[in-house]
Amino acid sequence: MSKTYHFIGIKGSGMSALALMLHQMGHKVQGSDVEKYYFTQRGLEQAGITILPFDEKNLDGDMEIIAGNAFRPDNNVEIAYADQNGISYKRYHEFLGSFMRDFVSMGVAGAHGKTSTTGMLSHVLSHITDTSFLIGDGTGRGSANAKYFVFESDEYERHFMPYHPEYSIITNIDFDHPDYFTSLEDVFNAFNDYAKQITKGLFVYGEDAELRKITSDAPIYYYGFEAEGNDFVASDLIRSTTGSTFTVHFRGQNLGQFHIPTFGRHNIMNATAVIGLLYTAGFDLNLVREHLKTFSGVKRRFTEKIVNDTVIIDDFAHHPTEIIATLDAARQKYPSKEIVAVFQPHTFTRTIALLDDFAHALNQADAVYLAQIYGSAREVDHGDVKVEDLANKINKKHQVITVENVSPLLDHDNAVYVFMGAGDIQTYEYSFERLLSNLTSNVQ
């Protein structure tokens, strides 16, 4: 039976994906959010989903209301009105936990790589059989007839605890979100609690020391590059400017050669996890092989464009591990070009906690440009760290730039520009694109 859903904070990446999925399943969907443009809203607009400003008049007791996790009575009029008037609502993760019970569910968790891996698994499985999915880049697809449900499983504030999927991948465990987690051990404990809720199969990266300590009542399958100790092993790697080719073995059995048109060693591991899960779940590997070849990636993960013959890459990387992976992918695809990193640190707490690691990661580029730190709505800038503190630790050519003046980026010939961050780094990218376009106009 069709329902009416109202999303408080519909432009959030998970919220927009869920809204799209429910819309495609035949439900009436609307939502509210701030007026500022966010990259997820284009998909909502194309689907004809109404986006309203926050207003208590948006709420109706007959609706099923889903609220974004960032909103509280003290910062959102709709939440405040709902609480004052006894109107019930569910948080995103609470709704998702109950929603997935009607499907064979497959989750993807991990400190890094979960969006790309969720996208890859969704792409392959939806081409094999009817599948609904939610990806953290704001993409969602729903089918009333789907048996399978693929979703991204987020560890922040332990939001994944309402989830009990049949299968799950955990890509890695790393210290992140220092505004919530107190230590690597705290992060591990969250993932270990999640792992205990998997019912049929858990697939973890076997070369991650923390993941080796994971326990679960479900069978655990390890994947990696090393033959010893891993169940699914990727070997015979061929990394070229058109993608990556590799062979996968399962406990000594050759499962064949696979190709992905994406870049970086991390994507080979993501694909190995997907292959392992689908093989274990009983899917035809020939179909898996065929559809991996057409996976082009997800939004804001190594997204490329060319402006005035200049290659620009946009990536959500906001943790040192992710920066290293993104720069590795750029070098694979563009081995003869200078790799220029343009990075905006995201949150003061993360920048303080990982300052030396950020410097080490950014030193993998040939030149580094830094934008001012993007503070989260959850924190206050106490002046404990500035972007110049990071700049002082970088030993490659580096400079702090402003969105009003990105012209220093023009000092490079034969370069690829990699814009990275989870804040508003795209405003710097767009400023650079306008500068490049104006150069073309002036020449003409």
Curated annotation (Swiss-Prot):
ATP binds at G110, A111, H112, G113, K114, T115, S116. Pathway: Cell wall biogenesis; peptidoglycan biosynthesis. Its EC number is 6.3.2.8. GO terms for molecular function: ATP binding; UDP-N-acetylmuramate-L-alanine ligase activity. One of its GO terms (cellular component) is cytoplasm. Signal peptide: none annotated. InterPro entries: Mur-like_cat_sf (IPR036565), Mur_ligase_C (IPR004101), Mur_ligase_C_dom_sf (IPR036615), Mur_ligase_cen (IPR013221), Mur_ligase_N (IPR000713), MurCDEF_pg_biosynth (IPR050061), UDP-N-AcMur_Ala_ligase_MurC (IPR005758). It catalyses: UDP-N-acetyl-alpha-D-muramate + L-alanine + ATP = UDP-N-acetyl-alpha-D-muramoyl-L-alanine + ADP + phosphate + H(+). It comes from the Bacteria. Pfam families: Mur_ligase, Mur_ligase_C, Mur_ligase_M. Cell wall formation. This is UDP-N-acetylmuramate--L-alanine ligase. It comes from Streptococcus pneumoniae (strain P1031).
